[in-house]
């Protein structure tokens, strides 16, 4: 009965979305290991996302789309610089040094990092004496502790490699070196920080331009241009832009159309139905599938440090989300002391969505 009335539909969709994102990270890692420039991947990925979402934005929001002024365009340009270009630059470069598992673990930290940055820049106020405030702070600190554990402790391998796979790793072993592993984790954390900063910037932009799909298309378009320029500044070798390997082409099309196109639409729908915290709960699914794909597709070893560190990050994420839920209930009870139920929360989420405060996350790393 629960499935028939549609209550399980958002759950199934979020599991599928995070599975798709985990697969995308594993495939992109394989392409990076093949020698493709990480900014070339970012450029093509954002370009495909732009082409995929443009028709959806045009038809879906044509009646509600406000005028796109020069001021909003400038804000979207800088939002794209932080949320698309710099985030993709750090994440993909960090991914080339580490693994898809670690990349997804750092992505899982984004809500906590965004919260910390909101406190630093005084965008959000918090009552440290309340249980909700203490829970959110504790969750954020645990996430950061998990990130440090991922960075500083690699641990022993939990899986064995066959002789052929060992030979392949010897030929491409830069990610196996401890110093490169640490550099990769630092880059992934920088990517998470850029992504968290973008959340705060885009929240302000959404107040003036609350059309999520149109905003995403403009962001992706600006991000495409910016990533292309960053790539050309780093290397002017035109041959780097010519992709001949079928796996490279399929991976980039999949990453753009599915991971940033379809997943954007699906996540947006789930936010409308169940709220942003509901969608955040499924982030660990991407981490689990990334680990499986890392092992099954890339044939990489799974290390103790990755498992323990990822577990700490996920534990911190759930502590943070529980604190956030409690805070939302406390705020609602202050306004309506005798009323708080799922219907009220869904109405509040829908109202916030219309105002642009609940946004889709188009720049998935």
Swiss-Prot record:
InterPro entries: EamA_dom, WAT1-related. GO terms for molecular function: transmembrane transporter activity. It is found in: Membrane. Residues 25-144, 196-321 form the EamA domain. It is a multi-pass membrane protein. The chain crosses the membrane at residues 8-28, 40-60, 72-92, 101-121, 132-152, 181-201, 213-233, 249-269, 277-297, 302-322. Keywords: Membrane, Repeat, Transmembrane, Transmembrane helix. Coiled coil: none annotated. GO terms for cellular component: membrane. Belongs to the drug/metabolite transporter (DMT) superfamily. Plant drug/metabolite exporter (P-DME) (TC 2.A.7.4) family. This is WAT1-related protein At4g01440. It comes from Arabidopsis thaliana (Mouse-ear cress). The lineage of its organism: Eukaryota, Viridiplantae, Streptophyta, Embryophyta, Tracheophyta.
